[in-house]
Amino acid sequence: IERILSDIKGRMMEDIVLLETKIANPKKQVFQLQFAVGEFDMVVADNANATCEIYEVKHSKEQAKEQFRHLIDEEKLKNTEFRYGKITKRTVIYRGENATLENGIEYRNVEDYLKSLL
């Protein structure tokens, strides 16, 4: 039951982040991007500047390498840049502290992220 609840909370958090980001960025495309294996939970594409930002949304409070595995997958990055322009940001939105890793991946606290949209 705990795993199911965690799954539901994770999906709800994804939906809230996606919806609020869409509302805050009416001139940009905001969507999930599916691949044969895996997905980016959110892409914010700026067609006017041919750039995009890619995100993973996690319900966890902890940082873990598997959370950003898609954000460092060269094939996914190449395909995304081909379709939506240069990737300017790779971020994991989660419930822990803000941090930037050595590989450039950013961790953003979900509450801070949502407040920044206002």
Label the model's feature ranges:
Residues I1-L118:
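A cross-kingdom feature that marks ATP-driven nucleic-acid transaction machinery
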